[in-house]
Amino acid sequence: MSAHTTAEQSPKRRRIHLDNDSKMHFSSILEDGTSKSQEALLPPRRARGYQLEMLSESLRQNIIVAMDTGSGKTEIAILRIQRELERCPAHKFVWFMAPTVALVEQQHSAISKQLPAFQTRLLTGAANVSHWSTKKIWDDILLNIRIVISTPQVLLDALSNGFVDLHTISLLVFDEAHHCVRDAPANRIMRDFYHYHRQEEGTDGLPHILGLTASPTTRARQTDLEVLEINLNAVCVTPKMHREEMMQFVHMPEYRSIEYQPDVQNFSSIVEKLSVIINELDIENDPFVKFMRRRNDLKSRQRLLDALENKKTPCLDQLKRCLRRSRVIHRELGPWASERFLTRCIMGLKSKQTNASGPQWADWDREDNSYMLNVLSQVVSSTEMGVQNPPDELSRKVHKLIDFLVLEHVNGSIGIVFAEERTIVIMLAQLLSLHPRTKHIKTTAFLGSSASVSRKSDITELHNPIDQSTAIDDLRTGKKDLIIATAVLEEGIDVPICDLVICFDLPKDLRSFIQRRGRARKKGSKFALFLHSEDRATSSELHLMEKTMKQLYLENKRALEHIQYLENVEEEGYDGFRVASTGALLTLSNARNHLSHFCGTLSAEFIATDPEFVLEGDDTTGFSAKVILPSFLDPKLREFRGILLWKTEKMAKRDASFQAYVALYEAGLVNDYLMPAHHHIDDEDGLEQVEKRPSFAKALGSLNPWAAIAKKWREAKHFYQNLIEISAGAQAFPPMVMVLPVELPCDISFRLFWNEHSTLLVSVKRGGQDFAADLIRLAADTTSILLSSLFSQKMVPGSLDFSWLFLPQMESIPSAIREWCDSVTGTISLHDIRDCDMAGFENPGLVRPMDNTARPCTFEKLVWRKYVPAETSDGASLSEQVTYDREVPHIEGRVWPKRTDFLHRLEPSNTSKAHHTAKCFYPANNCSVDRLPVEYSQFALFIPCLIHSIENYFIANELAQTILHPVGFSNLSLVLTAISSSAAREASNYQRLEFLGDSLLKLHTSIQLAADHPLWPEGRLTMRKGNIVSNGYLANAALQTGLDKFILTKPFTGAKWRPSYNTDHINTGDMTEPTREMSTKVLADVVEALIGAANIDGGENKILNCLKIFIPDIKWSPLNECVNILHHQEDSFSDENNNMLSEIEGLVGYTFKKKPLLLAAVTHPSSKGSGHSYQRLEFVGDSILDIIVVQELFESPRCFHHFDMHLMRTALVNADFLAFLCMNAYREEDRGEAVENSKRRVTVAMTKRRAYLWGFMKHSASWDIVNAQQRAAKQYEKLHEEIDEKLRSSKTYPWTLLCRLDAAKFFSDIVESILGAIFIDSQGSMPACRIFLERIGLIPYLKRVLSEDLDLMHPKERLGLLAGTLSVKYETKRTQGVEPQRWECAARVGDEEVVRVDCRVSRVDAETTAAEAAVAILKTRKLQSEASNKVAECD
């Protein structure tokens, strides 16, 4: 048996029995006459439960969907087409048929926009399908086509000629299926081909059938419905209407009848003149007769005889048709309209004559045109044609219409006037647009589309095809508010809800009557019919229609009253559900409200969140309900059924809601207070919205490691000596020893900056525990000597209780140390130096002026020079002594720096004398020189820096050995960097590590949460992750663990440095101060920096240990374990077959082992089905993308500054950039296009069609999504070449162009969800993820960012920098009265409006464009100002 059960074989037929139920069915049509256009005009609507019910039924068997106009039949068809194409072989396709060209064009537009991944083909007469005369042409035209949209006649002809095989069609869709009767083309397709094959071969291989209709028959007879079902081999089904929906008030129009008296049939002189001229025409002058007389063949002679006998030629036919229509117009509209009609016919002929010079015009075409123009020009003179008189002589019927419109068509009204004749439609529209009383009404005309050759050449066809193509859109957008139309607008065509529908000509039957009335749905709407007072037959028919309609209304009203009565029946429910810990109670009464609230808190763009109910049963058996929850919930938590049968639908829905909410509670999505867990975070959870944190927190004072060391001095029996070496290129310093009672944490090295040009490298190497206790006192003496050389005023006199001891590297015996101390103690006076005798000064110490008027200096040499006030080489005076003419001995040397901070580079702008080491000259007789060699004094000068650096390592080590002990850091420098804030001005700070750690934290948190909570929706995962990685939460973790006391925030300056004594530390304790104010951001940053440091020090294991310390709320697991869990979770994904996936795999460059992962990755959360959507995968992919980019930036050999890395990451992972990459990803496929040459021979030219990645996204046939796709695609077509060029070669990032795409979030979501799917399917393979990113263009641009110096700063950020201290404001607003919606923005800096931009596609576009323009202006001003200053300086 085939997949689609036949009508006769169906075990669950839900037939509409018109003899019993037809009145209710038709009444619902009368009540709800919304057109298909409401999907675009009303708020966005997802696939409703009844639409999914119809979809499911269509997948099971052939059906005719009978649903009210405006209830979403087209969406059902689109969902069905998508499902069919996903499961059918690639060589098969879908054929969609609609009865009119206008409807075909409309449905082609809808389907191609809704299903952009599939090639569609519109086939109408305009494509000259009748000239496609070979099968090869058809095969080429249908190559790679998956959906064909045409009228039934096109398919019938193709099947009849054998150009198309019915077995290659997988699904036939009949829109307005009630036309499939008798000898209609749709029925001939079924009768001559479908049923023929069915009888011969069975249904195997035949297409599935889907019919769509709002009115199954035009007459209310059961037999007619049975015939329709037989014709389409389908069952007519309709979804069950909920009482709740039926009880909602629907505005029914007020019926009005407009009676008019027909005009006396006295035609105007012009019409009569045309009649006379046509009757008096000499047929021998007719172009056709002349042409045939010139031919001698038998066929031509016969055609000539027929023309002469019947007086029938092409020109005569058109002229007579023109006469007939002018008379109809005269009768219906009046003399003015008929005369204006003839004038327009003449103008049309003149226009054709002007344009008839091309090769496509045959000679007889020109002759016919000239002949008819000559005839008609005798009727209306050129003078009369040039006069544009306002409508004056009008029919009584038109006067009645104008009176009615003036009264009823008020401001804001939208109306339709139905007329039968095409020429009446055109002329009535022109008449109303020109009449003084109605010209304020914005009137247009709509005839539908027709590609008939006869109509193309008909001189009476006055409509403009361009106007026809925009008429409906103009009505939707408000450019027009009244449309005059033929019956083509009765059904199918999307038009807005109207409040005024007028039948200028009466409907032909009940169905037409119902369809027209259905267009009037607004509150207070009017439905008016023009009645000919003398036409009794018409009046009788209309009376029957009115009677039928009133009867339907009355019965519907009674039914609604009965339903309301039934729903008010009180029923006793079952016991509620009580939470023991809180006492919260869930009952049948409050369950539905709870459920609605829960769903509402998970709102997202393009997703309707209200629960849907599907009812089963009836008044006899009782009702049960199924509730369908939004698709962002896991499929296991998406559908729930009530457990009992109820008398009322109300209680059935409450029952289903109760069961659903209990299940949500048990799944952990509802907390103990019966509130959504994702929306109401419990205080005791520790994850409250800590982003509402203060900027600063009270933190512990900085740790003082010397306090613990001071205690060790009192207790230690053995001491550690550590070697200190200082080098500066060729210059060598004597090695020194540092003695401590504890072991150094590690070898230490750092740099010292002696002056602007000289940098020293300090190395401290740990030594053994081999310094004798009896040498401690001597080491204290050496320390005192060293410190006294420079810090005597800061020392405690007589105290040797230092926290650390220093001495030169020498033999560790008392005599050697004493000898050294004796040799370096004291000074030598230079007062008596003569003849530059340098004996005894082989290794001199610092030279000091005896009057202390100047800083010490080094001793380089003794020189003779005139006695002048001592000065340095830069001219700084060092004394005020009198100048002598004779030369005296001077000490030449370098000034000793006054500063003690050598850990920081000297800035070029710093001119403080404390930094100078310039050359100087001191009079020798006023100086003394230290016995302590200058190298030791220089070492003493470095002691503050040395102590500070060692102190930091002791702090870092204490942290590593206590709080961070589980991590097991091996590189203490990483810990030190991680706890060093930028304010501390250490050699390295945490910012780069924090940048890496932030990404690692998000990665592990995202993957862990996704693995631990398979039922959590993306919204809750995101909120939970956001809380965990928030600065507030991490700052709290730092305070809770005591990390705060280890954080370095105070910069070293050395300005107030003094030697450290053990006694002081014992008295003050292990804190430098009790508490301090610390930025909570710094606290959080240090936690992230430690995570980054752990990664560098030991990879994932150390990261996990670090996470366990600071975030113990989560049970952390290795990434591979989490990925395995996620990989196995895929087993619960939908396993439905989808042939589309291989195309996506080719596009993304990865073949999935588990195909449902890819299907989920391209499924929008609005999509209805049994599978997952992309939201959770996007949640995972976001963190994968971030870590790939961050690691590349962090590991770059260029060692970027953290600020630059932030700019780079933002440029590479922002939503606009990802959206562009998504829109720029495509695969090409062949497409054939018919080409007709001048001889009307048809060939097929092969072209390429791009299938874009975004087009494969599955969704719920949402017009909001489609419109967003189309807007962005339109912008992409305008901008993509420029954006591509900017990304390839520009030095500036195209922020403005990217935001101008106005791309919805789902474009970037697709990139991240596919990345997440690849990561899980490959079980954590980053190379596989990189291949995808390489393919879509992200990695190539990342390489540019890494290798080139690009300006990546956002214009708004750049403007803020240029503004300096001035404020920057953006005054943004919508541009009024512009369609489509546009924005304008003024950028203000301080009080000045720098620039104003308009006509932008979004608020973001407006502000970004304004910022970019303002930046350009301010930069120009700056350059001009600098140029002016230079000119001024030159002057």
Swiss-Prot record:
Residues 956-1099, 1141-1323 form the RNase III domain. Keywords: Antiviral defense, Antiviral protein, ATP-binding, Helicase, Hydrolase, Magnesium, Manganese, Metal-binding, Nucleotide-binding, Repeat, RNA-binding. It comes from the Eukaryota. The record marks 1305 as: Important for activity. Residues 591-684 form the Dicer dsRNA-binding fold domain. Its cofactor is Mg(2+); Mn(2+). Coiled coil: none annotated. Residues 54-234 form the Helicase ATP-binding domain. It holds the Pfam family Dicer_dimer. It is an enzyme of class 3 (hydrolase). A motif (DEAH box) lies at residues 175-178. Mg(2+) binds at residues 1178, 1309, 1312. GO terms for biological process: defense response to virus; regulation of defense response to virus; siRNA processing. Residues 400-564 form the Helicase C-terminal domain. InterPro entries: DEAD/DEAH_box_helicase_dom, Dicer_dimer_sf, Dicer_dimerisation_dom, Helicase_ATP-bd, Helicase_C-like, P-loop_NTPase, RNase_III_dom, RNase_III_sf. ATP binds at residues 67-74. The keyword Repeat applies. Dicer-like endonuclease involved in cleaving double-stranded RNA in the RNA interference (RNAi) pathway. Produces 21 to 25 bp dsRNAs (siRNAs) which target the selective destruction of homologous RNAs leading to sequence-specific suppression of gene expression, called post-transcriptional gene silencing (PTGS). Part of a broad host defense response against viral infection and transposons. This is Dicer-like protein 2. It comes from Coccidioides immitis (strain RS). The gene is DCL2.
